[in-house]
Amino acid sequence: MPVAPSPSETAAPVEERLVSVEVVVPSGVFWSGRARSVTVPSVSGTLGILARHQPVAATLKAGRVRLRTPDSPTAELRIGGGFVVVDDDEVTILADDATWVQAR
């Protein structure tokens, strides 16, 4: 009796869902790119953002932003506070200032 293929054998490869990220400081765009996930330090706690996240706006405190990009391990930057807006797989971080954190 023939055996039907499992769904994993017939399914097309799943496209990885990414978010578009823009980190903006007073002097202009600090970084822009795509990420698997973004973690920001909101005043009410750490906020993790993935694709298909509900729209949200939050105030950020000074701390580290973690960017998990498709082609590298997690990158971190330090911000001095600001705001984050998430809408339709787009993440905009408006920061007072930003600097890259060196890998240890």
Label every PLM stretch briefly.
Residues 20-104:
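Compact, glycine-rich, soluble single-domain proteins
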